[in-house]
């Protein structure tokens, strides 16, 4: 199917809006993040008859999206572990991030990761300086996960916009 100018313009609008929402969603997790970039990619492919955005590109973006979804949790766990957290701190950081996001959107996931790891470590009997250190690790790891997701959104943007431009 030959693409029309209207379809191509629509694809560009969808991709730009989708990528903007994705970037904001990574930083403000009350919005869906990277999955919006995938949705925009699929819709742009459909609008262009899968000529510019082909199935291989969509699969590639889907794989990146799946990987990026694990960055928050993985970053939290790796950060907490590197800063000395035990099992309690790892669970506390993960639970705290989720509860924080629900109770204090949009930044509660950061506060929750820190407070959860610190609190659970303290409850497990760790001295306060060690518990605090685990909380800092969970916070820094969560921030690293956000950074990783932003990198994924930028990579998706470059690839998808390049394909739409005909590169």
Residues of each region from the PLM?
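Hydrophobic, membrane-inserted alpha-helices
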Residues: 17-22, 41, 92-100, 137
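Interfacial segments of multi-pass membrane proteins
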Residues: 37-53, 95-101, 115-124
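Helix-adjacent hinge/juxtasegments
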Residues: 56-100
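Short, strongly hydrophobic alpha-helical membrane anchors
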Residues: 1-10
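Transmembrane alpha-helix interface/packing and boundary motifs in multi-pass membrane proteins
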Residues: 19-36, 97-106
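Individual transmembrane alpha-helices with interfacial aromatic-anchor signatures
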Residues: 102-104, 136-151
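Juxtamembrane boundary at the C-terminal end of a transmembrane helix
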Residues: 2, 155-167
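Alpha-helical transmembrane segments of multi-pass membrane proteins
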Residues: 18, 22, 44-45, 64-72, ...
């Amino acid at each position: 199917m030959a693409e029309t100018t209207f379809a191509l313009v629509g694809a560009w609008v969808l991709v730009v809006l989708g990528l903007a929402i994705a970037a904001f969603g990574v930083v403000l997790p009350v919005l869906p993040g990277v999955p919006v970039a995938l949705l925009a990619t699929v819709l742009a492919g459909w609008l262009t008859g899968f000529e510019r955005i082909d199935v291989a590109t969509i699969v590639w973006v889907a794989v990146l999206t799946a990987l990026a979804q694990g960055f928050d949790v993985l970053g939290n766990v790796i950060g907490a572990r590197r800063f000395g957290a035990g099992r309690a701190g790892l669970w506390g950081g993960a639970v705290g991030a989720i509860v924080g996001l629900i109770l204090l959107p949009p930044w509660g996931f950061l506060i929750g990761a820190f407070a959860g790891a610190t609190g659970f470590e303290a409850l497990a009997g760790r001295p306060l300086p060690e518990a605090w250190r685990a909380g800092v690790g969970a916070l820094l790891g969560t921030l690293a996960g956000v950074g990783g997701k932003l990198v994924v959104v930028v990579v998706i943007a470059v690839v998808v916009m390049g394909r739409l431009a005909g590169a």
